[in-house]
Amino acid sequence: MPWWGDLHPSPESQPNNCPPGLRSESPDADSTIRAMSSSHVPAHHLPTVNALSPLDGRYAAKLSALRPLMSEQGYMHRRVQVEIAWFIALSDAGFAEFKPLSPGARTYLMNLVKNFSEADAMAIKEIEKTTNHDVKAVEYWIKSKFEARPELQNAGEFVHFACTSEDINNTSHALQLKSSRDLVLLPALDKVIAKMREMAHAFADEPMLSRTHGQTASPTTVGKEIANVVVRLQTARSKIAAIPLMGKMNGAVGNFNAHLSAWPAFDWEAFSKKVIETPEPLGLGLTFQPYSIQIEPHDYMAELFDAVARTNTILIDWSRDVWGYVSVGYFKQRLKAGEIGSSTMPHKVNPIDFENAEGNLGLANALLRHMSEKLPISRWQRDLTDSTVLRNRGVALGYAVLAYHALNVGLGKLELKREALQDDLNSAWEVLAEPIQTVMRRYAVAGAYEKLKEVTRGKTVTAEDLHGLIRSLAIPDAEKERLLAMTPASYVGMAAELARRV
């Protein structure tokens, strides 16, 4: 059974709690709104049509892999994991007051993490109604699980020992980000990269007219233009994957004050480092942060979110470009039976996947960039402004993952329209002014650039115009023949070779 649950917020259950701004002067309309607001369905079981966020509403099914990792329940699960890892490590530290745990107790504790369920999460939420403190609720829940085992019950005060809430939170954040990055974000991005690499190879030899400043320019190939994006994405992906995810467990202001008050001679820094860097499940598998205030500085998060945002910016650029290629007819989109493109124009086949991706990438970047700017800033030894922002990490990543899925779907619908590509090339003979003047320069023909400018700039140029000019040039006959054989479609340089390299 999965240990996560739905994340759909519940409307107020009392009819008179309908917001005044939604009330109508009409009794019938008002009663309808009250009826809509009086659902008694538990918040975690609401249908998606009642979700406030489209990530848990319209797009919920597309984010089923991310939800268990970045939801509040996922956050609770990681907190339990951190508390248990710290507790077990303390039992192995050699303290006379806390003997090593038996194998049975260790297995029991590890199973609390492994089998963490929706019911467990709801039990913690119930405790939080009394404590009004989410981390303390986790601590009390763990202690409640010790009641049936005297060995653990006697050691209950070592749960959350010497820890500040942020020791548990920051490591949980890092664990969430690690799993989300490695198990969801990067695999979704990899699918886009793989599909685009496949297209770059398939279309490596398909000539295409370039446009710089929106005007005709030296031809390329479709595959080479896709390869450009693939290389950018590969570089961006490697940066995301390489960022170390940090964790600190050093107390209320980062100095091990409480720890040393209990055992002054113990090497708490080395102990903390071991818990943080030992691979899961015995440790946390993170990178140790030795210097902090109450909170981990969040610099690694800023770096991670900036790296994801830069990747998204590359994909926004590509989404707009491929949208344009569809618009001018270089690509058509495969039809899907039953789909409708417009409520009034039956002929429409819109590039909705690329538009959806562009919009969601923009939303992701707005959040990611806010977090990368805000999170490294905290007043003195800490303030709470980071807490509410951090709860939106999953939202930011959710919009990014959603966009990657949309791009992958959109790319899979594309079919190349070679006739449109060829038509554009055949109407742009002026682009051969570049190779002609370059060969003229090789043979020291005076004013080569200026002569071609006079013939081509702002004019409609035909093959015959250029061929007449070529024949009149004082260059070797072999060079004339080479230039005469050239067409806009053949003048692509090493584009095909470059496309195949990626």
Predicted features and spans:
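Acidic, glycine-rich loop-and-beta core segments that form the ion-binding/anion-interacting portion
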Residues: D267-F354, E358
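Tryptophan (W) side chains
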Residues: W3-W4
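Short amphipathic alpha-helical segments with heptad-repeat character
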Residues: K178-L186, D190-I193, R197, A227-V230, ...
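A helix-coil-helix interface module used to build multimeric assemblies
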Residues: S37-H259, W263-E277, G341, F354-N356, ...
